[in-house]
Amino acid sequence: MQPTEKYYEHDAYRREAVGHILAAEPDSRTGGGRIALDGTVFYPEGGGQPADRGTLTLADGTVLTVTDVHEQAGVIWHMVTSLPAGAVPGAEAAQAIDWAWRFDKMQQHTGEHILSGILHSMFGAENVGFHIGSDAVRMDTDIPISAEGLKAAETAANRIIWGNVPVNITYPTREELAALTYRSKKEIEGQVRIVTIPGADVCACCGTHTAFTGAVGQIKILAAENYKGGVRLSVVCGGRALEAVQAMRARQAEIGALLSAKASETANAVHRVYDEYTALKFTHFGLCSQLFDALAAQATPGADAIRIVPGLDPDGLHRLASRLSEATTGLCAALTPNEKGTGYCIAQAGGDVRALTKALNAALNGRGGGKPGICQGSCAAEPEQVEEFLREQDR
């Protein structure tokens, strides 16, 4: 089969074309199929960039939805949701890509080139992984880069955007290629397509890009984490960057409203609330210790000690049960009402409460476990029901 002409390689802004069907194959699993064309504006998945999506319209007006696109041995296959009788070799198919989808990928891919090139020139970092995800672009470097370094690179990358320099596509000869310094993640056979962004990057790439860097709009690094000796970046460009900044501003406004603080003062307000919370937590811990000591003092040595205390968190339950088991060798339990029913912690000095815990979970729809001397969990029953169950089991 003849290879498919790739219109998108020469004009990434071309949205429509009319091609002829080379082959059409049904897919019995999905009820759809795949169609190969002699020329296409649809970009196939590859090089970290998702495939285009859109429609194919046959001569009789039948519209086929293209959900995915793949390349095999130079032939580009368009996955469609249905394969009507008119989809036969030689038939015309009018192509239309989802332009909003494509332009987003052009912004992300061009932005990735700019930032990767800047990171390479500033720090010698190699891009060893790249994927345009639904929310952000993932970029992996082979060396660690500091937060200060990433900030400097982000600023430099955006300066390239502000310069609105052309994104040049060339197809050098083997001789020209041998004299050219460019980035490439793998050995490439056949004609090499070089994407050059003056002042930023020279890279072998088959993807779609904006004609000028200004169309990228903005590059924003959202997150960075250490990954396999390098750093993994979460990056957004263009419309995604605008949406990310708008979302950040909305969250900041919400926090500011809650804390009665201006946008420029939210960090200080959060620190203040955190300090207050830490102080209250320390006070709460001390008051709980006093309460647990008082409850333990009420326990009769050798007798059971089951206490219901509202408002305890898992740590508080564990502390109370442990404290009770220090005061008596009987069965001890700390219970507190929660959204599921009851949080519990069962303990017994020198005993094994695992079988009892298992029985409680089975009887009261609970979950939990632990060590012989202490078990913890929750169940779908009121604290009073749990207390009654424990007392009956211990008779």
Residue ranges and their predicted role:
Residues 1-395:
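A glycine- and charged-residue-rich anion-binding loop/surface
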